[in-house]
Amino acid sequence: MADKEAAFDDAVEERVINEEYKIWKKNTPFLYDLVMTHALEWPSLTAQWLPDVTRPEGKDFSIHRLVLGTHTSDEQNHLVIASVQLPNDDAQFDASHYDSEKGEFGGFGSVSGKIEIEIKINHEGEVNRARYMPQNPCIIATKTPSSDVLVFDYTKHPSKPDPSGECNPDLRLRGHQKEGYGLSWNPNLSGHLLSASDDHTICLWDISAVPKEGKVVDAKTIFTGHTAVVEDVSWHLLHESLFGSVADDQKLMIWDTRSNNTSKPSHSVDAHTAEVNCLSFNPYSEFILATGSADKTVALWDLRNLKLKLHSFESHKDEIFQVQWSPHNETILASSGTDRRLNVWDLSKIGEEQSPEDAEDGPPELLFIHGGHTAKISDFSWNPNEPWVICSVSEDNIMQVWQMAENINNDEDPEGSVDPEGQGS
């Protein structure tokens, strides 16, 4: 009987998701300046824009690149570099153009948004997360289903993978006992990589160390303060010795690599009422950071007084797995997770007065809800070169590259109001 009820619930949920998606699609011309939807061969659990951009002469688009991965059913997995053509501001984008045969949106005049896979490198198991090294973006670290963290220099690998499926990383980083997701390169110290793991620890490597046999580098330091799965780790963006970590023990910990005590952080806070899945330091304000949790909230923190949570962002209906500050705007951050939504928040609107109708859609600081995904969002990335452009990937193979309409973040009242999720008013 329970099985029947579960099947019925699933069918109802699927119908609701489909209806919501239809409404979203109908409203895209009002809500977005750009939407590109691309079905990947396999879902990617990870997405990160590379920092470079090419602007071909005489063309109405620029070329950007993404680091992706695969999560296959039992077939060979790959680390993937893809290229994306984004239309210039003066190119005509027609959001109503949907190519049903290709299953992708994106006409700008006669040019359709091109997304192409450029490089595939054999990988051991799915790519839980992949992140490039800021000082040399050709170097990419990956988290695997094993305890190893792999490092690839993609310039040293052919763009088409060896059919044997042999995975040949340039380094193997050892120190963990289990897999995990958190991964962070130090932006101020080249080659210093942090990794978080299900084994309750955080490992630090210096990849400039001389590898042992088999290209293996052992962890330089192992931090053991958490008492449960460590979900995420992140270096501070200005201070080379500071980093933060979050875990299923509901704690946010701040660490200083100059301390000799690797089992006790500088600060430990009970950050949420459930597992803490992600964190992000503000690129403009050295004291501000955000954490996202299974308690469905994003929390805002000030390093100078961690006893006091500055704010709690509430609108998500389920666990939050990713939070990232905008690289272009000090007050803007985004969060995503299991509820299939990516929310963009604006700190500067906290506490603004709202009409009762507006309040029904969410708090004033909820700037935008991206409703284009029909499955859990695994990861997203703000484009470093094009303000307000985000790439998001979901568990159903879909990758979307999108930009909310300029009038939404410009504080101008658009003609005919549309609530943030495009469910029309």
Swiss-Prot record:
The protein's role, per its UniProt record: Core histone-binding subunit that may target chromatin assembly factors, chromatin remodeling factors and histone deacetylases to their histone substrates in a manner that is regulated by nucleosomal DNA. Component of several complexes which regulate chromatin metabolism.
Annotated protein name in UniProt: Histone-binding protein RBBP4
Record's keyword annotation contains Cell wall biogenesis/degradation: no
Nucleus in keyword set: yes
Cellular-component GO terms for this entry: CAF-1 complex; chromosome, telomeric region; ESC/E(Z) complex; nucleus; NuRD complex
Gene3D superfamilies linked: YVTN repeat-like/Quinoprotein amine dehydrogenase
Subunit-level organization: Binds directly to histone H4, probably via helix 1 of the histone fold, a region that is not accessible when histone H4 is in chromatin. Interacts with CHAF1A, HDAC1, HDAC2, HDAC3 and HIRA. May also interact with HAT1.
Assigned keywords, A-Z: Acetylation, Cell cycle, Chaperone, Chromatin regulator, Chromosome, DNA damage, DNA repair, DNA replication, Nucleus, Repeat, Repressor, Telomere, Transcription, Transcription regulation, WD repeat
Family as reported in the entry's similarity comment: Belongs to the WD repeat RBAP46/RBAP48/MSI1 family.
